[in-house]
Regions:
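An N-cap/entry alpha-helix motif that binds or orients negatively charged groups
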Residues: 1-59
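Intrinsically disordered, low-complexity sequence elements enriched in Ser/Thr/Gly/Pro
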Residues: 5-10, 20, 139, 146, ...
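Intrinsic disorder/low-complexity segments
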Residues: 137-165
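Alpha/beta enzyme core
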Residues: 42-46, 51-137, 163-297, 302-354
Length: 354
């Protein structure tokens, strides 16, 4: 049947009717709230490019986790800002690292909160890359790792033109550090391990290490399709993790490639991922949708810092209605097929949903 018998506006006449037939619903339990944890006590420093988001000390992280839990938010994910950085990413895998300390404190003080650990090395490496960096030598068989000068600046090696040709992120050597980091986080009480580095084989290496350490029931949420995106800028300020040279396009995905994203997801599933993630969310809704069509495991999506800051800028200038665009943006991600959404709006959205 068609018009005038069929009138789709009939079911749009009131809030109650619209709610009755709504196809996509948001719930606070589907949100994951990111926290940036730094050294100190009583620290709550707003991030300039992310209004309303803060670098916080462990004690403040406990209170944030408590509030998020009280609002029904599904979980939190921790990112660490270590006191010192080095080329072994020591702060990522030592048992007294900032994320490990925060995890123990939160699990001790906030009952039943789900804590997810981001496993990446960029925040902990002095050069800001997600793996071990080696400079390719002009003569065969002779290469040396990049070094930072004693004054904190780049050394002669690092100040040379940093291109994809001259520098290499060592994939297999990085896996050992990632695995150590995952086990250390699990020992601290982390509920879910979430590798975001985009090294080949990291899920399998982490799964093996967790199992050997006795953490057979600790699930892995893999950042399986993480794209080399321009939307990460504010996060890199928040986590002090911008690369000191070059970029991350040799390991993060090309944003033009949908089929390759499906291969990445498939490989991570075969290696033992229990859940997968697409990052960023908004520019890659088609990737989320295709992943939902092909795979039957839980799918997460990250509404990243650039998405958040872009909306916040328009909201603060009065160009967009705050409450509407928060929920509309999250609904689009959910409608595309994401079961979980990592978002800096988690607490705000939970309050709006009541």
């Amino acid at each position: 049947m068609s018009f005038p018998v069929t009138r789709l506006r009939r079911m749009r006449q009131s809030d109650s009717l619209r709610s009755l037939i709504r196809e996509t619903r948001l719930t606070p339990t589907s949100f994951i709230y990111p926290l940036f944890v730094c050294p100190g006590e009583g620290v709550r420093k707003e991030i300039g490019s992310m209004p309303g988001v803060f670098n916080i000390s462990v004690d403040e992280a406990v209170e944030e986790a408590r509030e998020a839990k009280s609002l029904g938010v599904g979980g939190i994910i921790l990112f660490g800002l270590p006191e010192k950085k080095d080329e072994a990413a020591t702060g990522a895998w030592i048992d007294d690292g900032i994320v490990q300390r925060a995890t123990r404190a939160i699990k001790r003080e906030v009952r039943d909160v789900v804590v997810i650990g981001d496993v990446c090395l960029c925040e902990y490496m002095s050069h800001g890359h997600c793996g071990i960096v080696q400079k390719k030598s002009s003569s065969a068989g002779n290469a040396s790792p990049s070094k930072r000068g004693s004054n904190g600046g780049r050394s002669a090696v690092a100040t040379q033109a940093a291109t994809e040709v001259e520098y290499e992120i060592l994939n297999d050597e990085t896996l050992e550090i990632l695995a150590k980091t995952a086990v250390s986080q699990a020992r601290a009480g982390m509920d879910i391990i979430a590798p975001s580095d985009m090294m080949d084989g990291r899920v399998g290496a982490i799964r093996k290490a967790l199992d050997q350490a006795g953490f057979l029931n600790t699930p892995i949420l893999s950042y399986a399709a993480k794209f080399a995106s321009g939307f990460y800028g504010p996060f890199r300020e928040a986590a002090d993790s911008a690369p000191q040279f070059g970029d991350r396009r040799s390991y993060q995905m090309d944003g033009a490639n949908l089929r390759e994203a499906m291969r990445e997801i498939s490989l991570d599933v075969k290696e033992g991922a229990d859940m997968i993630m697409v990052k960023p969310a908004m520019p890659y809704l088609d990737v989320i949708s295709e992943a939902r069509r092909r795979f039957d495991l839980p799918i997460a999506a990250y509404q990243v810092s650039g998405e958040y800051s872009m909306l916040q800028a328009a909201i603060r200038n009065g160009w967009l209605d705050r409450d509407r665009v928060i929920l509309e943006s999250l609904t689009s991600i959910r409608r595309a097929g994401a079961q979980l959404i990592l978002t800096y709006f988690a607490k705000d959205a939970a309050r709006l949903l009541g």
